[in-house]
Design a protein with these regions (language model features):
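Pore-lining transmembrane helices
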Residues: 1-243
């Protein structure tokens, strides 16, 4: 939005002010207006519908509920679907802490899993992804699911299903083991307030390794794009005028 607004020429006297104030302010107001008066209503309706649907699943059993919550938590890595699942568990942390016992794990397995994947099979990832993997593990430990976004953006068809499967596995284990998380958050940072810490930690490892192994099985080795170009240049160097 700001990039498009910069096409509007301002007087020379306002150019400096435009970059640091006018363009960002107008861009924020326009974007916020679109969300509040445009797409905000439909998105809110969808989220409310998902929340009501989750509430109706209270009697279906722990494994189906854990599977659904785990899949939703990992699906868009901090997006609207993730927020519905996490808020559903967070708002009941006082009465049903076992929900956060599972969701707390599902929150962190996507980034931790992708970080582990880069360590297990570094040839399948480029330099940027390897560096992102180190940061992803740390982000997962403090409950930030968004650490997996760079990997999903580069290869969504292989990464997102792997994140979902790992989160489902990670969510089911605490549900069945009776783990209770008394904090409305996830990751390893909440261990001090978790009842059943060993199972919680096992679930994080299990979900992370399932994600890592699955995504590495699906991905091919990464090939540097410049490799082909370097070969071509070497071939050109070997060409002589005699050959022409």
């Amino acid at each position: 939005m700001v990039k498009e607004l910069k096409r509007i020429k301002l007087p020379i006297s306002l150019k400096t002010l435009g970059s640091i104030f006018i363009y960002p302010l107008v861009g924020t107001l326009v974007t916020g207006g679109i969300i509040v008066w445009g797409i905000g209503g439909p998105i809110a309706a969808i989220m409310n519908g998902l929340t009501n649907w989750l509430s109706s699943l209270g009697d279906v059993g722990k494994v189906p509920l854990a599977s659904i919550l785990g899949a939703m938590t990992a699906f868009d890595m901090g997006g609207p679907v993730n927020k519905v699942a996490t808020l559903f568990a967070q708002t009941q942390v006082d009465t049903l802490p076992y929900l956060m016992g599972g969701v707390g794990v599902a929150i962190c397995t996507p980034p931790i899993g992708m970080g582990i994947a880069t360590l297990l099979a570094p040839k399948k990832y480029n330099v940027e992804e390897k560096e992102a993997g180190k940061a992803a593990i740390l982000m997962g430990c403090v409950g930030i699911t968004e650490g997996a976004i760079p990997f999903a953006a580069n290869d969504p068809l292989r990464v997102i299903p792997s994140l979902i499967v790992g989160a489902v596995v990670g969510n089911i284990i605490p549900f069945l083991a009776g783990v209770l998380n008394h904090a409305p958050w996830g990751g390893l940072i909440v261990l001090p307030v978790v009842e059943g810490r060993i199972w919680y930690f096992i679930a994080v490892l299990a979900g992370g390794f399932v994600t890592a192994l699955m995504v590495n099985l699906l991905k091919k080795n990464y090939v540097e794009e410049s490799a082909g170009n370097d070969t071509d240049l070497d071939d050109l160097d070997e060409i002589t005028f005699d050959e022409l």
